UniProtKB/Swiss-Prot annotation:
Function recorded in the entry: Catalyzes the conversion of AMP and phosphate to adenine and ribose 1,5-bisphosphate (R15P). Exhibits phosphorylase activity toward CMP and UMP in addition to AMP. Functions in an archaeal AMP degradation pathway, together with R15P isomerase and RubisCO.
Enzyme Commission number(s) of this protein: 2.4.2.57
Enzyme class (EC, first level): transferase
Protein name: AMP phosphorylase
Coiled-coil zones: none
Annotated family: Belongs to the thymidine/pyrimidine-nucleoside phosphorylase family. Type 2 subfamily.
Region forming the signal peptide: none
MF (Gene Ontology): 1,4-alpha-oligoglucan phosphorylase activity; AMP binding; pentosyltransferase activity
GO terms, biological process: AMP catabolic process; pyrimidine deoxyribonucleoside metabolic process; pyrimidine nucleobase metabolic process
Lineage, opening ranks: Archaea, Methanobacteriati, Methanobacteriota, Stenosarchaea group, Methanomicrobia
Length: 503
């Protein structure tokens, strides 16, 4: 069938076209089927149908397909029915509880990266992986496929270190301290981090307050080789590109299949050339891993996958039932991290976790004797070497190396919530705390953050400040404070949670 091309400057994430329902019927295709669009070049695209947007005799072509085929408006193209990718049948195989082969897994991941699958097909794969879990072979094959379908970095010097946290704990700013400590010891650490999806700020969001974080894979290698480390946003690279597309499906479904968690983390680390890693697994109420028992099992799974990939993995089960440190979100978190590097001061939870994990990495990297890593980490901070290295990393990433903790901007709209009575703080809700921060504008508004004046187990008097919230916009601050009063993030003993009266 001959149709006239009509461009649409809309990104849809794949090759996609839209044709009139009458033309679709004549072609024998339905919405979700594929067609070949032929001009000087040929592409295969997913079909959408319409009764109104595109008139008969025309074909609407979205940006990705338009840029690939390079036709001009109203140019006549040939449109023919095309078969679905073979990977669709492999997805159906997983839905039927069958084990996939290495080749089948690679085909699925390749089609995800190339945009050859519809949202329905990708969702089917993610859901099937969640319901019918993958075995160790499938997880390894998925990891390798995610690496092969994106950019990879290799270094001439080894070991190449990395650190990753499963997440779920507000205030987990330790990457900003760990990366310069490890690099100051002479080890390489090309740290790629994520932005917050449901949290108040990921490591990349925090680092972006100090310097740019969006770099290509070759730039990451160059910066790491020059100063020993970097802390960048993984989403700006083409490293394991299938991961972001899978996450986009998982998020609205509120699922995180273990197989894809393992593959996602390990593919990104393997692709940047890391061969030695410490994995932080926070456990506790309102974290991703509620119990230590579940944490141990996840640790074993990661270590087994590391063995299969030739990576040395050690895991740290950490307490995640309460925020790390006293600063959560944006500039206040960055300030707290920098104060630790500047003065070796700060909340005990931040100091202890940073030093413990850094010590593990220094021992694994071979620069500290067994059981001496933590001592070396402390010396690197107290001597100023870690701070100097952090400034070098900031500079190589395009930031101001003269920045100090008191120069980091925070929101100028401020409110403090007071305790309604005397008593001990019994609980801090991680989820409510994060929700309040997001209502205040985090992670988009970099000035948003919370300072906790009291933590779990501490005594508070009536009228004392429980926490202070900073924001960039007054109306967002008001919305967040109102929410915190309706659903308190802190429970002080003796507080009435809800009053129920006779009507």
């Amino acid at each position: 069938m001959k149709l006239r091309a009509q461009p649409y400057d809309i990104e849809v994430g794949r090759y996609e076209v839209i044709i009139n329902s009458a033309d679709a019927e004549e072609l024998g295709v339905l919405a979700g089927d594929r067609v070949q669009v032929k001009d000087k070049d040929t592409i295969t695209a997913v079909v959408e149908t319409t009764d109104a947007i595109v008139s008969p005799g025309k074909i609407g072509i979205y940006r990705e397909a338009w840029e690939s085929i390079k036709v001009v408006p109203d140019e006549v193209v040939e449109v023919l029915p095309a078969a679905k990718p073979k990977s669709v049948s492999f997805i159906r195989k997983k839905m039927d509880k069958q084990k996939l082969t290495s080749e089948e897994m690679h085909a699925i991941i390749e089609d995800i990266v190339d945009g050859n699958l519809t949202e329905v097909e990708l969702t089917a794969f993610v859901t099937a992986s969640y319901i019918y879990t993958m075995d160790s072979d499938e997880i390894e094959w998925m990891t390798r496929a995610m690496v092969k379908t994106g950019d990879q970095i290799s270094f001439d010097v080894h070991p190449v270190m990395d650190h990753h946290s499963i997440g779920g704990v507000p205030g987990n700013k330790i990457s900003l301290c760990i990366v310069p400590i490890i690099a100051a010891a002479g080890l390489l650490i090309p740290k790629t981090s994520s932005r917050a999806i449901t949290g108040a700020g990921g490591s990349a969001d925090l680092m972006e307050i100090l310097c740019p974080v969006s770099f290509r894979a070759d730039e990451i290698k160059k910066m790491t080789t020059k100063v020993g480390g970097c802390l960048v946003w993984g989403g700006a690279t083409n490293i394991a590109p299938a991961d972001d597309k899978i996450i986009n499906v998982e998020y609205p479904l509120s699922i995180d299949p273990k197989s894809q968690l393992l593959a996602s983390v390990m593919a990104k680390k393997f692709a940047v050339g890391a061969d030695t890693m410490v994995l932080d697994i926070p456990c506790g109420n309102e974290t991703k891993i509620p119990t230590v028992q579940e944490g141990r099992k996840l640790a074993r799974d990661f270590m087994e996958l590391g063995d299969r990939l030739g990576m040395k993995i050690e895991c740290a089960l950490t307490y995640g039932g309460t925020p790390l440190g006293r600063a959560i979100g944006g500039g206040v978190e960055v300030r707290e991290a920098m104060v630790m590097l500047e003065k070796f001061e700060g909340p005990r939870s931040l100091l202890e976790k940073t030093i413990a994990i850094s010590g593990m990495m220094l021992e694994m990297g071979g620069v500290a004797p067994k059981n001496e890593g933590a001592k070396m980490a402390v010396e690197l901070v107290k001597s100023g070497k870690a701070l100097q290295k952090f400034k070098e990393i900031i500079e190589v990433q395009g930031g101001d190396p003269k920045v100090t903790s008191d120069m980091v901007p925070i929101g100028d709209k401020v409110a403090t919530v007071l305790s309604p009575q005397d008593g001990y703080v019994l609980e801090i809700s991680n989820k409510r705390l994060v929700y309040m921060c997001r209502l205040a504008g985090a992670p988009h508004d970099k000035g948003v953050g919370v300072i906790l004046h009291k933590k779990k187990g501490e005594y508070v008097k009536k009228g004392d400040g429980l926490f202070t919230l900073y924001a960039d916009k007054e109306w967002k601050l008001d919305a967040a404070i109102k929410e915190s009063l309706r659903n308190p993030i802190m429970m002080v003993e003796g507080m009435i949670l809800e009053k129920i009266e006779v009507v």
